[in-house]
């Protein structure tokens, strides 16, 4: 019986799952909107919600816990400096999942997971900065 089993295994080891969700959470925090499979989006939501709640707390221990979870200092910096201030008045529900049809190759249900009140310019900002830096070096 599956009683009390909250999370899916995704046919991965525990370490692989932890790394996968750290990468997905980092991508979501960086871009504020990502497209992934529906089951991954549903399992990613509580991970990100807990990280934003940690960031709202804002103390040193919370920052270290977020670093241990995400393993990327730039993502943690954005989480604590930008997102924590944006959601300080909201008691939860920082993300939304929007169903986006089915993937062409294998008909897997796909979803968009994004932050509520997201910054629209955040998606692709790193790519634009990288392209501008490459143009500056080339010129």
UniProtKB/Swiss-Prot annotation:
The keyword Iron does not apply. InterPro entries: Ribosomal_bL17, Ribosomal_bL17_CS, Ribosomal_bL17_sf. It holds the Pfam family Ribosomal_L17. Keywords: Ribonucleoprotein, Ribosomal protein. GO terms for biological process: translation. GO terms for molecular function: structural constituent of ribosome. GO terms for cellular component: cytosolic large ribosomal subunit. SUPFAM superfamilies: Prokaryotic ribosomal protein L17. Belongs to the bacterial ribosomal protein bL17 family. Part of the 50S ribosomal subunit. Contacts protein L32. This is Large ribosomal subunit protein bL17.
């Amino acid at each position: 019986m599956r009683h009390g089993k909250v999370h899916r295994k995704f046919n991965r080891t525990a370490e692989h799952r932890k790394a996968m969700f750290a990468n997905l959470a980092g991508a979501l925090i960086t871009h504020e909107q990502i497209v992934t499979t529906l089951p991954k989006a549903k399992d990613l939501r509580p991970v990100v919600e807990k990280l934003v709640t940690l960031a709202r707390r804002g103390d040193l221990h919370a920052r270290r816990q977020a670093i241990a979870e995400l393993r990327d200092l730039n993502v943690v910096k954005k989480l604590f400096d930008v997102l924590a201030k944006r959601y300080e008045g909201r008691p939860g529900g920082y993300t939304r999942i929007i169903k986006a049809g089915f993937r062409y190759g294998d008909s897997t249900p796909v979803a968009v997971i994004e932050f509520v009140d997201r910054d629209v310019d955040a998606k692709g900002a790193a790519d634009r900065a990288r392209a501008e830096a490459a143009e500056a070096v080339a010129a």
